[in-house]
């Protein structure tokens, strides 16, 4: 698996390394992860993580989904797309826990498909 974050790209070949990678928060107690297997970049998981929460996007050719969290409070949550402080405001309705994000990434690592344990909204 190719894994990219605030610090650059690495290759990951075992699930324990993936879990360790997903715990990295090099700036603002946050990170933006891109996980893929192909040079083309698809399918991919794109994860905005901050503290113990995340928003997960699944993208493949012709289909895009975003995680659906348990909050119906509306509003937005600030995440970061880089170490320079580039901010991204994402809907609180899409926020899932760190544990849910890790389980989704582990399933993606194993299957190369959209993780089934998250609820998704099609974009």
Swiss-Prot record:
Q: List the protein's name.
A: Double-stranded DNA deaminase immunity protein
User: Which Pfam families does the entry link to?
Assistant: Imm1
- Quote the function comment for this protein: Immunity protein component of a toxin-immunity protein module, which functions as a cellular contact-dependent growth inhibition (CDI) system. CDI modules allow bacteria to communicate with and inhibit the growth of closely related neighboring bacteria in a contact-dependent fashion. Bacteria that have this module inhibit or kill bacteria without it, giving them a growth advantage. Specifically inhibits the toxic activity of cognate toxin DddA (C-terminal 163 residue fragment) upon expression in E.coli.
The record's gene field reads: dddI
What is the annotated quaternary arrangement, including any partners?
The toxic domain forms a 1:1 complex with the DddI immunity protein. This protein blocks the active site of the toxin.
What is the originating organism of this protein?
Answer: Burkholderia cenocepacia (strain H111)
Q: List the disulfide bonds.
A: none
What if the gene is knocked out? A double dddA-dddI deletion has a 100-fold growth disadvantage compared to wild-type in competition experiments.
InterPro entries this protein is in? DddI
């Amino acid at each position: 698996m190719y894994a990219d974050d605030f610090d650059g790209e690495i290759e990951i070949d075992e699930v324990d390394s993936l879990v360790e990678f997903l715990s990295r928060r090099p700036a603002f107690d946050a990170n933006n992860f891109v996980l893929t297997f192909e040079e083309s970049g698809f399918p991919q998981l794109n994860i905005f993580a901050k503290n113990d929460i995340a928003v997960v996007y699944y993208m493949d050719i012709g289909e895009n989904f975003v995680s659906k969290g348990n909050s119906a409070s509306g509003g937005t949550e600030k995440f970061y797309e880089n170490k320079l402080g580039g901010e991204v405001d994402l809907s609180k309705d899409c926020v899932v826990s760190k544990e849910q994000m890790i389980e989704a990434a582990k399933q993606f690592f194993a299957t190369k498909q959209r993780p089934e344990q998250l609820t998704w909204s099609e974009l």
